[in-house]
């Protein structure tokens, strides 16, 4: 006990996602980006934050992408990856829920933005939110440290089982 449930800060902050409907053919009529917030997703959500999609330690993108079944088995309805920068880079290709915190609104609300640095990177964290939007768990990791799939899945298990 001791951890009181509270609504996830910044859950209504508008993040951008590459529009899955977008294609070169439809570029004229379809915006390349959609605005979504964490509140727009339903169910039990595991939010994994990464500094950016362009930088170091990008194998975490593949870890998440290739192990979606493990997250689902751990009880997560949605796995949402939030980055600070470079949503257009190749690292995040194939991740349906890759969002960029363009205005750093989500990062600031959750104290994930780097202190005193003019960078847009977000610190690494795994944040679980239940179906009511309440934050159940948060596990921060070292900015430059790569997490393992086991560690990320364990966070979901702890939160949702």
Regions of interest found by a model, annotated:
Residues 3-161:
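Chalcogenol-based redox active-site neighborhoods
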